[in-house]
């Protein structure tokens, strides 16, 4: 267990956080479609990043494209609201991926808020690429 904590600290994570418009079934479903589109869009680059800074730089350089990607999914599925993409430091609960535990705390992330952003959220660790593998 100690090794898990040490490994997590050695590779400071960068996260993806998507917040649905509401808890309604349609809003929750489109949140997952946005997730799939964003993970597909970033898969090659995110898995090639050597460190958190490189992953964050990629997200910063492509922030408008990532927001457009989310908005395209929303429009294609008949939603009138849009997505807002931001980079920042946000609170997250603890999470274990295999043998690596990331404790609860503030982490750097790409956050996509869909519409009002009042629904259940989905998140993962993009670097190291744990939600891509």
Question: In which residue ranges do the predicted regions lie?
Answer:
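Solvent-exposed loop/turn segments at secondary-structure junctions
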Residues: 23-24, 90-92, 130-132
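Early exported N-terminus immediately downstream of N-terminal targeting peptides
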Residues: 12-63
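General N-terminal targeting signals
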Residues: 33-35, 47, 100-104, 109, ...
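Flexible, solvent-exposed short loops/turns enriched in glycine
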Residues: 123-133
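Solvent-exposed residues in well-ordered beta-strands and their adjoining turns
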Residues: 19-21, 115, 127
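Mid-length scaffold segments of soluble, non-membrane domains
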Residues: 56-121, 125
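Hydrophobic membrane-insertion alpha-helices, especially the h-region
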Residues: 1-7
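Secretory/periplasmic and organellar redox-cofactor proteins
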Residues: 8-14, 98-102
């Amino acid at each position: 267990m100690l090794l898990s904590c040490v490994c997590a600290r050695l590779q400071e994570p960068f996260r993806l956080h998507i917040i649905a418009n509401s808890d309604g079934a349609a809003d929750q479903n489109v949140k997952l479609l946005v997730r799939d589109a964003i993970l597909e869009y970033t898969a090659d680059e995110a898995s090639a990043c050597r460190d958190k800074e490189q992953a964050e730089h990629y997200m910063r350089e492509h922030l408008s494209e990532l927001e457009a990607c989310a908005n395209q999914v929303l429009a294609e599925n008949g939603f009138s609201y849009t997505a807002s993409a931001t980079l920042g430091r946000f609170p997250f609960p603890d999470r274990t991926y295999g043998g690596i535990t990331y404790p609860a705390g503030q982490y750097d992330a790409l956050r996509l808020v869909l519409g009002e952003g009042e629904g259940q959220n989905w998140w993962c660790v993009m670097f190291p690429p744990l939600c891509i593998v």
